C-alpha cells in the first residue's frame, strides 16, 4: 500500500508544471508601433521573454494616433489599462494635467537603477513635471536631411568627407538649391511631403525654433514675425520649383529614392528604407543623412521621443510589485536599444549612444548630435502627435505652401484658431 501511495504521489508531482511557472508574472503591454518599428519591438519583447522565465510580456499593438490615446484613457477609467505602454513625449503636456500618466517616485527609480544622467537631457526634461517623472524616454526621433552624394558632388556641394558643404544659412541653402537645379539632373533639388500637416509641422517648427522663437509664449500664439518668416521660407521653396507641390508622403520619398530629387527632409524612421534599398541594389546612388542645417541663425531641430509609461487608474491602480517589474523591463529595453537604433532612432540611453557599436552605425552616428539641440513640441495641451496644432498646420500651413493662402494670412488664421482653444 505504501509503495502504491508513493507511486501515486510521484506521478502527481510529475504532472505538476515547473515551480518557476507558479512565479511567472504576466505584464500587459500596449504599443502603437507598426512597420519596421513594430518588427524591432516585437523582437526585443521576444528576447526579453526568452531570457526572463519569471516574467511574460503579453503585447498588443493598437492603432497609432488619437485611437491609441483615447483607448488608454477610456481603459484606465474602468481599470482595464495595460501595465506598461509606449507614449509619445509630445503628448505629456496633455496627459499629465489630465491625470492619464502615473508618476514614478524617486525611490522606485533608484531601486531600478534608473538615473537621469544616463538619458538625453531634453528627453528627460520632457517627461518631468513639477519635479515628478512620468515616463522613461526610449529614443529621440527627429527629421533629418537625406542627400544624394552623386548630385551634390556634381553641384560642388559635397566635401571630401562625404558630407554636404555650404548649406548653413538660408541664403547659402537657397543658393545650393539653385546650383542643384542648374545641373539639370533632377526634377527637384529638395523633396518635401507638402500635402500633410504632421510632416510640415516638423519642418515649420524647426525653422521657427532656429530663429529662437516660441510657438506659444505665455498666452500668445506665434508672437512676432518669426512664424511668417518660417512659413514664407517653405512656401518659396515650392513656388520657385525647388520642392514639389501637394505631394503625398510616399511620392515624396520616391522622388528621392528614384534620383529625381537631390535632397529630402523626412524622419529618421526612413533610414531603414534607404539602407534596405541600397543593400538590395535598388538605390542607384550613394546617400547620407545629416541634421537639418542651421538656416535661420540657431541650431535646432524638431524632435519627439517614444517613451515607456504606466497609465494612471483610480479604478484599479497598478500593484507596487508590478511597478518594480515594469521598471525592470524599461531598464532592459534601454540597455538593449542598439537594435532600436537600426530603425533610425537615436537611443535616449547614453551608454548605448556612447558605445562603439553605435558610433560605427552610419548615418545614425553622424546625425545623433541633433539630440543636443532637439526642440520638443510646446508644453501645451494644444501640442503633441495628432493634437490641435497638427490639425491647424493641415488647415493653414499646408494651403500656404501650395499657393492657396498667403503665409502671413495663414499665420494669422492659425493664431485665431488655436487661441480659441487655449
Task: Cite the ranges covered by each PLM segment.
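Extracytoplasmic "Venus flytrap"/periplasmic binding protein-like
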Residues: 43-47, 51-119, 154-156, 262-263, ...
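Long, aromatic- and glycine/proline-rich binding clefts that accommodate carbohydrate-like moieties
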Residues: 122, 287-292, 342-399
Amino acid at each position: 500500500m505504501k509503495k502504491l501511495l508513493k507511486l501515486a504521489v510521484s506521478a502527481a508531482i510529475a504532472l505538476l508544471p515547473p515551480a518557476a511557472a507558479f512565479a511567472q508574472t504576466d505584464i500587459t503591454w500596449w504599443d502603437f508601433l507598426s512597420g519596421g518599428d513594430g518588427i524591432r519591438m516585437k523582437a526585443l519583447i521576444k528576447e526579453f521573454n526568452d531570457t526572463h522565465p519569471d516574467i511574460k510580456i503579453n503585447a498588443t499593438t493598437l492603432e497609432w494616433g488619437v485611437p491609441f490615446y483615447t483607448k488608454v484613457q477610456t481603459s484606465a477609467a474602468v481599470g482595464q489599462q495595460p501595465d506598461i505602454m509606449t507614449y509619445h513625449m509630445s503628448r505629456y503636456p496633455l496627459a499629465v494635467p489630465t491625470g492619464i500618466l502615473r508618476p514614478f517616485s524617486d525611490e522606485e527609480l533608484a531601486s531600478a537603477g534608473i538615473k537621469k544622467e544616463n538619458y538625453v537631457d531634453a528627453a528627460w526634461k520632457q517627461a518631468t513635471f513639477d519635479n515628478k517623472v512620468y515616463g522613461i524616454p526610449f529614443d529621440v526621433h527627429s527629421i533629418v536631411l537625406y542627400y544624394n552624394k552623386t548630385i551634390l558632388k556634381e553641384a560642388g556641394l559635397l566635401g571630401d568627407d562625404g558630407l554636404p558643404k555650404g548649406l548653413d544659412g538660408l541664403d547659402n541653402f537657397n543658393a545650393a538649391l539653385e546650383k542643384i537645379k542648374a545641373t539639370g539632373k533632377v526634377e527637384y533639388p529638395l523633396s518635401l511631403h507638402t500635402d500633410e500637416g504632421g510632416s510640415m509641422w516638423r519642418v515649420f517648427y524647426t525653422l521657427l525654433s532656429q530663429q529662437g522663437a516660441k510657438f506659444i509664449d505665455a498666452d500668445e500664439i506665434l508672437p512676432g514675425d518669426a512664424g511668417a518668416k518660417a512659413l514664407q521660407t517653405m512656401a518659396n521653396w515650392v513656388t520657385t520649383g525647388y520642392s514639389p507641390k501637394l505631394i503625398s508622403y510616399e511620392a515624396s520619398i520616391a522622388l528621392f529614392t528614384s534620383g529625381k530629387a537631390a535632397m529630402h527632409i523626412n524622419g529618421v524612421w526612413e533610414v531603414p528604407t534607404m539602407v534596405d534599398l541600397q543593400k538590395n541594389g535598388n538605390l542607384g546612388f550613394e546617400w547620407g543623412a545629416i541634421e537639418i542645417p542651421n538656416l535661420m541663425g540657431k541650431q535646432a531641430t524638431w524632435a519627439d521621443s517614444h517613451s515607456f509609461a504606466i497609465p494612471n487608474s483610480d479604478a484599479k491602480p497598478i500593484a507596487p510589485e508590478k511597478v518594480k517589474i515594469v521598471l525592470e523591463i524599461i531598464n532592459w529595453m534601454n540597455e538593449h536599444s542598439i537594435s532600436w537604433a537600426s530603425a533610425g532612432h537615436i537611443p535616449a540611453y547614453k551608454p548605448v549612444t556612447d558605445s562603439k557599436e553605435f558610433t560605427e552605425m552610419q548615418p545614425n552616428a553622424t546625425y545623433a548630435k541633433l539630440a543636443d539641440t532637439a526642440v520638443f513640441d510646446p508644453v501645451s495641451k494644444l501640442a503633441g502627435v495628432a493634437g490641435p496644432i497638427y490639425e491647424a498646420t493641415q488647415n493653414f500651413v499646408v494651403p500656404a505652401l501650395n499657393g492657396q493662402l498667403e503665409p502671413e494670412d495663414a499665420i494669422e488664421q492659425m493664431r485665431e484658431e488655436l487661441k480659441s482653444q487655449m
